[in-house]
Structure formats: C-alpha cells, structure tokens
Amino acid sequence: MAIWGSSSSNTASSGEADIKTHLMNQVRQEAAVTNARNLIGKVNEHCFEACIPNPGTSLSSAEHTCLSQCMEKYISFWNAVSRGYIARLANERKAYGGGALDASFVQSGESSL
C-alpha cells in the first residue's frame, strides 16, 4: 500500500540515522583520544619538570611519589574543567534550542588515566 514509497523512505531515514550515529560516535572517540594525548603531554611537561630536576637512570622514591601526586592532581583538575566546560556547552545548547548533551559525551570528556 505504499504508493508514495513511505516504507522505503523509512528505511532510508533509518539508514541515514545509523550513519549519523556512527559518525558521531567516531568523532567522540577521536575527541577522547585527542584529549588523552593532550592530557598526557601536559602531565609530562608540568609534572616531569616539577618532580625531576636532575634526570638520572632511575626514579628515587621521592620523585616517584611526587610524579604520582602531581599526575593525580592534574588529572583531577582536568576532569573538573572538562565537566564545567561540558555543562556550559549543554546550557548554551539548551538556550539555543539544541537540546542537552547525552551522558556518553559527558563521560567521554573525562579522563580516567
């Protein structure tokens, strides 16, 4: 009974939705990888310089402790800033009628290194 091709139209729009979902997931994954690389780079830059003034062949226990604490703090700050930024984006999207960000995007914005 589909004179105007309504059943095939539903199939096409379903396929387009699948493609859109796949692309959005791929972009989220790429953004998460980029964020992780940035985080690791910043942690290396800041914590290494702060905790290891004279690099040697191995880390002392004090250097190891310093690196661990610095990394934990830096990652915690990174996550706090990410949550704030994502909340701001969600509020702006709501204000402009774009809807809220879904929970999977919020979780991918945080690092659990």
UniProtKB/Swiss-Prot annotation:
Keywords: Chaperone, Disulfide bond, Membrane, Metal-binding, Mitochondrion, Mitochondrion inner membrane, Protein transport, Translocation, Transport, Zinc. It is a peripheral membrane protein. Disulfide bonds join C47-C70, C51-C66. GO terms for biological process: protein insertion into mitochondrial inner membrane. GO terms for molecular function: metal ion binding; protein transporter activity. Pfam families: zf-Tim10_DDP (PF02953). InterPro entries: Tim10-like, Tim10-like_dom_sf. Coiled coil: none annotated. One of its GO terms (cellular component) is mitochondrial intermembrane space protein transporter complex. A motif (Twin CX3C motif) lies at residues 47-70. Its main location: mitochondrion. It is found in: Mitochondrion inner membrane. Belongs to the small Tim family. The twin CX3C motif contains 4 conserved Cys residues that form 2 disulfide bonds in the mitochondrial intermembrane space. However, during the transit of TIM13 from cytoplasm into mitochondrion, the Cys residues probably coordinate zinc, thereby preventing folding and allowing its transfer across mitochondrial outer membrane. Mitochondrial intermembrane chaperone that participates in the import and insertion of some multi-pass transmembrane proteins into the mitochondrial inner membrane. Also required for the transfer of beta-barrel precursors from the TOM complex to the sorting and assembly machinery (SAM complex) of the outer membrane. Acts as a chaperone-like protein that protects the hydrophobic precursors from aggregation and guide them through the mitochondrial intermembrane space. This is Mitochondrial import inner membrane translocase subunit tim13. The lineage of its organism: Eukaryota, Fungi, Dikarya, Ascomycota, Pezizomycotina. The gene is tim13.
